[in-house]
Amino acid sequence: LQPGDVVVSAYQPHSALVKALFEPQSRLVDSATYDISAWSLPYAYGLNAFAAKDRIESGATMQPTKVFNTETNYGYVMQWNGITTAKVVAQLLQKGLVLRYAQEPFEENGNKFDRGAIIILKTSNQSLGNDLWRITRKIADENNIQLYPVTSGFVDKGYDFGSSKVHSFKAPKVALLTGETVNSEAAGEVWYFFEQQLDYPLTLINATDANRINWSDFDVVIMPSGNYRFLNDKSATESFKDWIRKGGRVVALENAVAQLANADFGIKLKKSDAGEKKDTNTYSDLKTYEDRDRDPLSESIPGSILKVNLDNTHPLAFGYPGYYYTLKMDDRIYEFMKDNGWNVGVIKRGSEVAGFIGSKLKNKLKDGLLFGVEDMGRGTVTYLADDVLFRDFWENGKLMFCNAVFLVGN
């Protein structure tokens, strides 16, 4: 144990709840479950957790510490490492600030900053005058986020703030495709996240009106899981692609990724290995009527946790270690992208961590892509094959979603 580690004791009246929420492998009495089969909080929050058989004596109850940010005349830097930081960035952008993020780690004044660190400079925000630091400190203080003052654009180690490894970005205009052909729960998750957590403006557009949409009115278009009929129209699809090539950014989630794969975008659904051995036993196809509800389970994955290997040098994975635990709700994985594609999140053989996976799917869920980015002209398409915002519960996926909206493509 290290100073500052949190101890959750099982010696308490809610010990059964502690066990249910923290045990790494959920125990299912019956695999015929109607909902997700794994929900361990350390995976959902992206935390390192350890179980101990012996009772651990800990100190006083943890008390939140209050951050006090000091004044600066040149600029601030803040770490990019969670949803609270993303909320601060969203609010600063709405106030008209131009921000920068670091593509590479750097060190300044004894502090180490990882990829994605947010840089706020006076030279980029002259129009705000003396209000710049008042606005910045007020928003950071309200969210208890530490700001690190800097006195120049030079750093002790790494790339200086004026280098090509530091990218500026402004507030993007974001649209969410909705309507009867879009999964209402999937769209609702995104809408709720923007409205209740980021407090960032979002324009809702009916996907059936795609032929009449002026895509150039927006910087980012979010496609939740759904059936996008306009992708079956070559003219409408080409208009959509043309907007992307001119600098538009798309964030596609779940089934929307499969829709784009079918519309000849740069991602392809991975098929089962042709070389897999098939059962040649004639009697293997025989089944009992009693098991009619259970047989389909061999090809199902009702919300299981898989470990995804991340390329955290790409902006989509900034703020993460070299891995991410995803909640897998379907059997879709994609081929590794080539040429203009970046394979940011991939799964390898033996990636299962917790939950139920049908016996016929275990060999399929390997050597494939789940999270990636396709460069298309001056724009990008971000593919998130799994639901990173699942029911506002999968906390560790929220930063990746913010990366896709604010950082990727800038």
Describe each model-derived feature in a short phrase.
Residues L1-N410:
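Intrinsic-disorder/low-complexity accessory segments
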